[in-house]
């Protein structure tokens, strides 16, 4: 089943306007890198953060009064994606699907830190609701007035593929007019420390090297409808898990094999880890391959949506960042590989089934 993208938005460390961030990516810009310090052990991490100004315009809603950064990112992206739709859907016929990986870590860490320091009696009833994975989806549904189906899908950097597949199933099997699919993540030293111990992070003493990933935060959102022209997701393949890093390229290769259909370029999930080599091996040396994570950072749960929006803009504008020779075939491949063994992918085609204006 093909799905039309009626609206899309992102909140990134490089900005929030889809067109503006896209221009900066094409120009070769990258989001600023900051150093985040862990007060517990003194460790330092390279991160890319979302400027506070990008969520300053949010409506004055009770749900946002004490909401963590992840919920504010999600609200900003979701509202913007809905606003982009030419014909706004009736909210009572819209489902919400939320993709997430680390969740509301800032408030979760504070909640359990108080318990560890002062005992269970110090647990904050205000912080506790923010510790569950579906808190951001709950906030967003309340802010938008969506009272129907609301789902939260938890996974790694490929979780966005699973969320999009769920949205496809919901639209195909119900009376829904549309599905708003949102993903968001926030940065906290606790998350960075976990990835540091797994040896995935870039060495803060060697920021210029391309080895290791730089954590980031933000959100992405797409409003999906039944096929009606415009940019369309043709096929979604959740993919298979891998249990060793050496298996990653084979699992990604099987995803590519199921999606091959006039693919002109690939928007991948390379982030400075083993994923870079696995993806290149899966798609081969000839296919143009670009990863927005190199410029925006590793946003984990939100990353697939940044990749999807990047692919849509590449199809629309006939430009691929970092490539002097634009591809000419009609489909973009979005390939996702997470650090916790998930893979997946999808194909996207442009408005007129021709990837780039003037191409044969």
Give the predicted meaning of each segment.
Residues 166:
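Internal active-site segments that recognize and position negatively charged phosphoryl groups
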Residues 157-159:
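Catalytic nucleophile serine of serine hydrolases
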Residues 175-177:
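Alpha-to-beta junction loops
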Residues 1-149, 161, 169-172, 184, ...:
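Conserved "HGTGT" condensation-loop signature of ketosynthase/thiolase-family condensing enzymes
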